[in-house]
Amino acid sequence: MAALWRGEGDQDQGDRPYQEDRWALRTLPDGTLLAVLADGMGGHAGGAVASKLAVDAFLKSIEQGQSLAEGLQSANAAVRAGAAAKAELTGMGSTLVGALVKDDEVRWISVGDSPFYLVANGKLERLNADHSFVPQIDAMLERGMITAEEAANHPSRHALREAVMGEPLTLIDEGKRKLAAGTTLLVCSDGVESLEHEKIAAGAKQPVRHLLDMVLAVGKPHQDNVTIIKLDRQA
């Protein structure tokens, strides 16, 4: 019997004056569930425009039967064209996570730092690579090259090594994974990281709105936009 997947998504603006996240969830003709999320950057107009362009182009590409890699390149081209059309949008960009789930397998592609989590048996695992400078900074901490305080306050900690900005992409994460019954997948913007991983795992079986409220309840100053798409394997 084919696995049955259920998906839902929602978002919150947090403490920001505007929403730069964009997400979409679609069921393709063959029953595959498609989820895509983009977290824009480049100011109020730029970030929101970039994330919309990226998601819309990615969706169109996948719905036309193209691969995840082709969808990503379409998203990148759309952001490039959008930035070229208006001078005030120069430098805009976004992260992107796209995932396809069908039967017992997930395939994904991502650029940037938006996390893609797997939750199984109460444990949270990040599936995709983090293209911010956090992994390098944490590695420096582990090697004793910097202190914990220096790592936490490093000026590049939240900077991205790669993003969908219309330039050639040098860092792209792609993968696939077999999934057991009862597995939950979470496609998120990095605003979710205000919440500890253990609490994300504990709230993964709740409705997305409940998980968003858990993030907001942390009360982090200047809470970023937060978006969560939840994919549950039912059988």
Language-model features: where?
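PP2C/PPM-type serine/threonine phosphatase catalytic domain
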Residues: M1-A235
